[in-house]
Amino acid sequence: MKKLNDKLQLIQKEMAQNIPVDILNAFGQSLHELIEQNLEDRALKVGDIAPDFTLPDAEGLPVSLYDTLQHNAVIISFFRGNWCPFCMAELTHYQEAINNNLVDSATVIAISPQSIHFNHDLKVQNNLEFRILSDKGNEIADKYGLVFTLQENIREIYKNMGADLELFNSDNTYKLPIPATYLIDKNKKIVFSSVSTNYMERADVCDIKL
C-alpha cells in the first residue's frame, strides 16, 4: 500500500506544473498567514474527551459518535471537501487501508461541511465504504476547535478553479475545518490526534496506533 505522503507530494508536484505562479503565490501567502495564527492551539488534543455528535451520512441517515463507540474505537477525519485533491487522496488512502484490513479494530468516519448530496457523490464516485458525514455550518468541527475563515482573496480563486464554497457548503460563511485526524477509544478519550493548518499534510494510517 502506497504511503499517503507520497501521494500528497505528487499532488504538490502536479500543482506546481499546472497552476499559474501568481495563484501558487497567493496560496502560499494564504497558508503562511493561517500558520502564523497558530490555529492548531485551539484544537482538541490527546487526553481530551471527544464531544458527542449526531450528523447525517451520505444517505441522510443519522450517525452518532457515542453510539458508534459502543462497538468500536473510531477514527475521525475532518476534511475540507471533494474539491480538495489532498482530501481526496486522504479518503482513498483510508479506503485502501480498509481493503487491506489495516483498520479492522476501528470504525472510520469522515466529516466535511459540504452538503449531503456532494458527500453522496464523493462516496459513490470513489467507492468509499465508510461513513461520510455532513457538518453543516461546521458546528461539530467548531466544537473540536478546528474552524477558520478563508481569506477573501482566496475565495474567488477557489471559485474560478471549481471550488464554489457557497455551492458546496450551502452557506456564505467561507468557514472550513483545519484537516484533522483523531482516534477515539471506547472510553470517548482522544488517544491520537493529527491537526495541521497546512492542508497538504495528513496523517498516514500507519501513524495511528490501533
Residue ranges: model-predicted function:
Residues 1-49:
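N-terminal targeting signals for export/organelle localization
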Residues 35-66, 74:
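Short, contiguous, helix-prone interaction/anchoring segments in small proteins
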Residues 42, 65-67, 100, 172-174:
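Short secondary-structure boundary/capping segments
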Residues 65-94:
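Short active-site neighborhood of thiol/selenol oxidoreductases, capturing the structured segment around
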Residues 71-73, 199-202:
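A short local loop/turn or secondary-structure capping micro-motif enriched for an aromatic residue
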Residues 91-143:
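Structural microenvironment flanking redox-active thiols in thiol-disulfide oxidoreductases
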Residues 131, 204-208:
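Histidine- and aromatic-rich ligand-binding microenvironments
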Residues 135-201:
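Thiol/selenol-based redox catalytic cores and closely related redox-interacting motifs
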